[in-house]
Each structure stands twice: as structure tokens, then as C-alpha cells.
Amino acid sequence: MDGYKPILRSLKSTDIEEFIGISRYISTTKGVGGIIKSRVEDFMIWEVLQSGEDSVRVFESNLFRGGYGEQLLCVMKKVKLDSIRAVSLIAKTLKIKSVNIGLCGIKDKASISWQYVTIPANFSGFPQPFKINNFIEVKPFKYVPYKVSPRMLWKNVFKIKIRSPKYNDIELINETIRELSSKGVPNYYGHQRFGITRPITSIVGKLIIKDRLEEAVSAFLSEYSILESSRSREVRRMIAECWNLKWAIESMPKSLVYEVKMMRSLIEDPEDYVKCLRVLPLRLRRLIVESVASEIFNKSLSKIIEEDKFNEVEVGDLVLSVDPLGRVRRERPIMVTERNLKQISEMVKDKKMVVVLPVPGYLSPIPRSSKGEKLLAVMEEEGVTFDDFKVKALPEASTKGSLRPISIPFWSFFVESINDESINIELSLPPSAYATVFLREIMKPDNPLAYIGIGG
């Protein structure tokens, strides 16, 4: 990996949040501490469409409604499996391409989740439910004329158990919620976007967008973290030292399916790094590139909070309107001017508009405010340009960029029960908002490994 120096080997768990750009809290209260995801049933997620159709209720009703269209809308229940891998397994089972399966969003691996998927209706065997091992169960719901997408999702609902809290003080939680209601919740990209124990995605993404593909492949396979399992760490270390791919395939934990596919590709074509990266699902290739932009967004947002600009609407800011469901309308942004500053500030306060920041891509508009200046400063620090996101070697992974609210546009939070052993909560968030980011303000753990069931 000429020119690339391994980073993760010296990364401590207490440095993870700084590494992925999450370095500020908006609330000033003490955290209740505790851990989440120590058991898979402690973290449950389901989707509600804009039509109000709840994926858990649809799944449990066992009703097929018929309908018309070229797509079959189903609910997929998955257990301890990430959404990209789940879609790949469904595609393999049905002998179709993964890109033909529609998704509203990617759900956490360490969870039980119920999410909508669409599958092309033109093959035999449907509309019958089916299972894949003990991890995936798919139940058809109805035929529809469209492929499901994030635009159709209203909200994600979470039931979460916080175990071993340091404080079981409901008033402390209520005080934090009041503060979040007043100030807003920073809309960071969450820890799982990058990986907590091995935050590799943005590292590989930066190498890809700089056309350093050999190094990108090598980093994906051999960059190890002191926080991952000892077996994974040892195999990656040996790959880095010896590059014995045949041995590594035999020794690699079975869960690391993408690494095995990449190594098999390299054995067949040792210098074809484009082919090697293309064994990864398209959604994952795009996610890897977009993680660079996500990290830049996070670091910019941290600077905005640090300089006390989070709740200030400035001339030059970009804003988007919010629909009656609380969803941000995907339209051309409005730039704040001296003339409309007062009106827009009132609309932001009333949650009818929201300040947005670019998640960089090759067509990103830039706010002409201090927020835009902070974004440009972070990009310069990272050595990344907007044109970098037009990926020459993997054009299918290129990203135009998007606009993301700096605060979570709408949310609801409810404590179901609280005692010395646990705090049970229900949380609703809009698409693309992260439960761990919201819980971070409530928990404020000493160590971010608390978000994967370790420490407290």
C-alpha cells in the first residue's frame, strides 16, 4: 500500500466519535449511561409508510391484499443481519439481481427489523411467504406499480432497551428531552454508517475517489482495528504482512463474506482492482463513497455546534420546507437573504422549514454563510474536492450529493418503563435519522462501544 499508512491499528475506542466527526453534544444534562444492543431483541426497528401502513402490523396480519402492478410489496423481517446482505441473500434465493429489489432504507445489523421491500412480480412462486435460514422471513403484502424507495417512507419506529443505566432518573431524561425540544437534535450520520469497531468505510472511500484502487482494496482487506475480534484482526494482520490470499480465505471468519469474494477475485485477476471492488453489492459501493461525504458533513456540523451557529439562521444559509408529516420536501433549496431572513427564521422556529447543509457530491450547492465556509474548510482539511465524487474508475458509485437537515426535522420519544436494570423507550424518527445519534444525547456514555452492548 505505497503511500498509504494504516490508521485503525492505533485507534482507541474513546477516539471513535472524533474520527467519524461526531464530537459535540447539543444538550448540557448528565447522561443516564447504560448500554444498548447487548441482545438482539433490545433493538427493534420497523417502518411506517406515508400511507400509514405499519410494517410490523402488516407482517403480523398475514393478509395478502392483491392489487395491481409489476412489483410485489413485501415485508422482510430480518434478525442480526444488515439490509444489504439480506437483500443479496433474497436475490440469490430468487435468482434475480440485488438492484432489482427495492428498499426504503438500510437497517442496523444488530437488531430485529421489519422493513418494506419490493420484488419484481414476474416470476413463479409468489405471492407465497418464504424464509432464509433463521435470519430472514419475507411476507408478500400487495402488488404495486412502483419500486419502493426512501421517498415513500414516513418514519422509522424503534423499541430500545438501555441496560445497566448509571442513573434511572426519569426527571433527568425529561430535562434532556425538554432541552432537545428547544434546541433541536443534531442530525449526525450515526456510528454504524462507518462501523464502530472498525470504521473502515470512509478510509476506503477516500482511496477510491482519489483513484488509488490498489490501496483501497488492500485497506478493505488488511486494515485491522484493535477493537474487532482477535480472529479477524489476526487474519487481516497476516494479509498485510504476507498477502497469502488462499490461506486467508480458509482462515477468514465466515461472517466476512465480502472479503472472501474480493480475495477470490484477486486470485483470478491479481491486478484487476475494479473487478475486485465490483464484487461488492452496488449499494455497498455507493455507501463506501458516500461515507466520505457523510464524514465531512459530521465534521462540519460539529464545527457549527462548537461555534454556536446550530440554532442561528444566517444570511446565505440554505433551507428546505417541511411537509405536514414532518418530512423535508426534496425541492430546490431557498437561500436566506437579508430580505427573507426574518420570515425564514420564524418558519424554522415553527418547524415549517429546516436549515440544510450539503452532503458533498459533484453537483453540491454551497451555502454562502459561515456554515458553508466550515464545510469548505473541512473538505480542504480532508484533501477532498467536489469533483472527486465523480468516480472515474467506478462511475456507478459516483454521487451528485444531497442536502441534509442539520437538525432532525421531527421526532417523538416516550419512556415505557424505567428501573435499576433497564430503561425501555419508544422512539420515532424520519428517514435517514439515526437512533444512536438521538440516544447519544440521552445516554452520554463514557465509551461509544456502549452503542454495541459493550461497557457503559
Predicted regions and their residues:
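Non-catalytic, substrate/partner-engaging modules appended to enzymatic cores
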Residues: M1-G456
